[in-house]
Amino acid sequence: MQYRTLGKTGIKISEIGFGCGNNAVLMVRASYEEQVSAVRHALDLGINYFDTAFAYGMGKSEENLGKILSDLGASPVVSTKIRLEIAADLKAATIEAVDAGLKRLKKKSVDLIQLHNRVTVERSPGTRFSPTPTDILGRGGILDGFKEMREQGKARFFGFSGLGDPKALHELIDSGEFHLFQAYYNLLNPSAGHPVPAGFGALDYGRLIDRAAGKGMGVAIIRVLAAGALTSSPDAGGGSSPEPLSPGSDYALDLERAEKVKFLVDGGIKSLTQAAIRFALMKPEVSTVLVGFSNVAHIDEAAACSGAGGLAEDAMARLRKLWDTDFGKLRS
């Protein structure tokens, strides 16, 4: 396992991170014995970064991870995320949410806390609260809650999920206040790290990864497998929500796009999964690639990508042609 520095934090984390989310279900629905076996195996392979959240099983993922790490006597780098409801006092709501997460994790402190809500230019009119940059950066806002947690010794660093309006996400990055963000980045939508043309079908994140690295932030890649579209068993994928995590990346469309990148599997790359992970690791600005696992074999497949090198230049040239034409939908 190879390691990279998490931005300006100085923390060394594994190139492959253990995603404890809903899609792979392991840390939410599997038996305790299966979960312990998987976590122990990941630790033995050198994986030292675990990412969880309240939203994963309504706290079950945090509870399961906390118990397992306690039982194993292990102390890897742990990041958890909070999802807030609209509140008159966002600072207080943030503090309350972080404290609740620590209780579920059975920890007095955590390495990283992150905001899980989408961030938008204007507050969402729907039932799910999407804060604005002002809600986060303003006086008495979410950032102040994170800072209070740091002052109390309950969190070392903080970040956010890079979902929502790209303009709002760029504003958070430009503030220089955060240590990490989670980037939506994969072979089917590379816009957080590569230029895409006007009219590209998926949301253009405007090279957020490069912008964040310029501010000294660490970058954790999410949805590297496009909710399962970039795996050997895409029929089992699709995520836990009928709505796509990122606009323009609904599962049916991603399955069509994935068909056009299957040329990446050759003698040197054994699976589309490995091609996707190795692609994400090509950017030096990336700190870790978060992968969700359903079993121990999946952990081995992902871990083998660390140190294996990136995609060949001719493969990258073919990918760029696909991106430049939105997978054949635009004229080159």
Each PLM stretch: what is its role?
Residues R29-A42, L90-R104, G164-L172, A276:
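Short, acidic/polar
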Residues M1-T9, G66-S70, T94-L105, A168-D174, ...:
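Short amphipathic alpha-helices and their capping/turn segments at secondary-structure boundaries
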Residues S75-I86, Q114-L115, L187:
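A short, structured active-site edge motif that brings together acidic residues
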Residues L6, F18, A42, F50, ...:
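Conserved, mostly hydrophobic/aromatic
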Residues M58, R118-R331:
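Beta/alpha (TIM)-barrel catalytic core signal, keyed to glycine-rich beta->alpha loops juxtaposed to Asp/Glu
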Residues I11-I16, G46-Y49, G73-P76, K107-D111, ...:
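Short, well-ordered coil/turn segments that N-cap beta-strands
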Residues M1-V77, I95, N186:
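N-terminal binding-site loop/beta-alpha segment at the start of enzyme catalytic domains
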